[in-house]
Amino acid sequence: MSAAAVAERLEWSTGKLTRSERNEWKFPKRTDVEALLDLYEVEGEDRAHLLSLTEESRGRSDWHQYADLFPGALPDLEAEAVRIRSYESLLIPGLLQTPAYATAIFESSQVVPPEDTQRKVDSRMARRGVLDAPGGPQFICVIDEAALRRVVGSRKVMTEQLRFLIGMAAHYKVTILVLPFEAGAHTAMDGAFALLEFPSPEPGIVSISTGVESLYVEDEAYVDRHRLIFDAVHNLALDPKKSLDLIESIAADYDKRA
């Protein structure tokens, strides 16, 4: 059976199938492994052994206990990526949010039941572990100045959040850039997105969150357009030092007015 036929039968992308065949999925989902075993009619001790290895692998990652909260298995994709480039227009990127900031976001949501808020926050904090994982991705984010100045929760929450960003900028895998208001109109004004890039020659994926669901697009032309869009906002953004200086200035203003 050809790779294309297998991907079609499983309703997987070709990139996902390629990663599984090369054993490059770092945290395989049990349901995905079971689907492959069913397709290839693997039974008995071999099946039990492979499922046992799957559970051992999953047990090493804190966020898998929250797998039901991530449509499209975003943490799996982040873990398999070699680089994530993100543009955020209104919010601090999820990978860089503090618990208090994330709590304020979920508490303001009309679609997250109050009883689910803490688990949502915990899942977001667990997801950050990908940045410290061996072989984890490089994370480059461009944050619109509007996201820094929008008060989420309170000024105290924002002070803590922005100071946390400054601390995370020292992480060797993290680059934080600010797109200032003075940059004016730009090509990414339609909204936020993340570009996940995998080992060559696998295609990249564009992730877009609508607030209700996450969309994942592998279409090559679509991904290429978003590479150009990211490059454009990256070129308009302040350099890392000026970005951190602006973040610190805004944090100091919040702190003074808290």
List each language-model region with its residue ranges:
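Interdomain hinge/linker segments and adjacent boundary elements that couple functional modules
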Residues: A4-R9, R22, K26-R149, A232-A258
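Short Gly/charged-rich anion-binding patches and loops
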Residues: S2, T31-D32, E160, F164
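C-terminal regulatory/effector modules of DNA-binding transcriptional regulators
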Residues: G135, V152-A258
